[in-house]
Amino acid sequence: MVDEVLKIESLDLEARGIARRDGKVVFVEGALPGERVYAATVRRKPSYEIARVETVLTPSSQRVEPRCPHFGVCGGCAMQHLEPTSQVAIKQRALEDTFWHVGKIRPQRVLPPLHGPTWGYRYRARLSVRVVPKKGGVLVGFHERKSSYVADMRECHVLPRHVSDLLLPLRAMIAALSRPERIPQIEVALGEGVTALVLRHIEPLNDHDITVLRDFAARHNVQWWLQSKGPDTVHPLDPAHGDTLAYTMPEFGLRMPYRPTDFTQVNHAINRSMVSRALKLLEVQPTDRVADLFCGLGNFTLPLATQGREAVGVEGSKALTDRALEAAARHGLEGRTRFATLNLFEVDVSWLRGLGYFDRMLIDPPREGAHAVAQALSQLTPAERPRRIVYVSCNPATLARDAAIMVHEGGYVLKAAGVINMFPHTGHVESIAVFESLADDEVLHVQQQARLKAELAAQEAAEATVQAGAASEQPA
């Protein structure tokens, strides 16, 4: 049913227009801020509705024609109909709003956004595979939007052109395998001049399958890696391909090798800009000792080691820290780097003190954030704490949560923050924030007030528990 005309006020990070009707929020798929649209309601909830655009009556000046013919069906992109600079502005607003709503803080300065290529930027991707006879056989691509179905993709403009051109040949190749229905996914990882494809196969491959893979690799100049079970089972079909994937950071003289299933940034161009900005914001001095928490393969640790006295990388996986150490040695940085393997989701202040004093700190956690690290930092005395911290985030909500701890309990100031457009045309918000410690007496005051507040909250909770227990013992 087509509803009355809706006026779109804003946009959420799923690229849904937000309108209001009779006091209820309406999320309108396909609409942009400032537009007047006819929309069909597709779902009604007590506090909100979801609708779909039927007709755009007054188009936004920010509306553009999506480049991809699959846009709107494929779930890989959500914002191709919105002009790229407007996409970034929406992400910046979302970041600032989240800081305030979650943490009751605002950055003193908004950093200019980091921009990079908006098309052909995805150097990593996970493509699902399904055998669907009704759609002509095998499908290879991203999931449909909000669905477990695989989109019928024939091209993809956020993948590099040569990878997009593989989508149809991959369909034919998988169809030629002995058990195509037992191939659930293919991961794509690109290095400089190298394209690696990781084939997830639930059942063992036979000689015929191996021949098909080798023929495809020779015809399309790709490497095949095979994965029969978990990540530890990944290995190259050709052993000579074991250490050929890499990305470079020429401004630091670094070449970073990695395996196709390792975590590396999707957008190599933005990664270089991000690392450069992080180091500039940290203001590392030649005498500084710097910590890099959640260091992974050393994406920040090795550049930090080129500028400071010592860079200490900490990561939960020993396999990653071992390889980061190998990369450091390959560049002659073993004397200026150290790596530790620790679960950073369970650290406390005594662990942090055990690592020694750091002049600067970089934190780059996964989506879960760095809650335990933020709590430990907030308990350090003025003499023990890093004076400046840069936090790189892929989740505004956990960044705001951790920032609130550092500011309201630890005596840090949120000096600056801004977005990194790592994933153009999606709602994903990557960001970077800079924290600086207050003066020593101000830090002590903030920490004391936080302790008093926590003690009062604990006392009130205990009293409420006693009262609830007493009430439950009263006769009916």
From Swiss-Prot:
Role of this protein: Catalyzes the formation of 5-methyl-uridine at position 1939 (m5U1939) in 23S rRNA.
HAMAP family referenced in this protein's UniProt entry, alphabetically: 23SrRNA_methyltr_RlmD
List of residues binding S-adenosyl-L-methionine: Q265, F294, N299, E315, N343, D364
CDD domains noted in UniProt: AdoMet_MTases
Chain's gene name: rlmD
Domain of life, per lineage: Bacteria
Organism: Bordetella avium (strain 197N)
Similarity field: Belongs to the class I-like SAM-binding methyltransferase superfamily. RNA M5U methyltransferase family. RlmD subfamily.
Residues where [4Fe-4S] cluster binds: C68, C74, C77, C156
Annotated Gene3D superfamilies: 2.40.50.1070, Nucleic acid-binding proteins, Vaccinia Virus protein VP39
Sequence ranges assigned to domain TRAM in this UniProt record: 1-55
InterPro entries (UniProt xref): 23S_rRNA_MeTrfase_RlmD, MeTrfase_TrmA_AS, MeTrfase_TrmA_CS, NA-bd_OB-fold, SAM-dependent_MTases_sf, TRAM_dom, U5_MeTrfase_fam
The keyword S-adenosyl-L-methionine belongs to this UniProt entry's keyword annotation: yes
Active-site positions on this chain: C394 (nucleophile)
Name this polypeptide is given: 23S rRNA (uracil(1939)-C(5))-methyltransferase RlmD
Annotated EC: 2.1.1.190
Reactions performed catalytically: uridine(1939) in 23S rRNA + S-adenosyl-L-methionine = 5-methyluridine(1939) in 23S rRNA + S-adenosyl-L-homocysteine + H(+)
UniProt keywords, alphabetically: 4Fe-4S, Iron, Iron-sulfur, Metal-binding, Methyltransferase, rRNA processing, S-adenosyl-L-methionine, Transferase
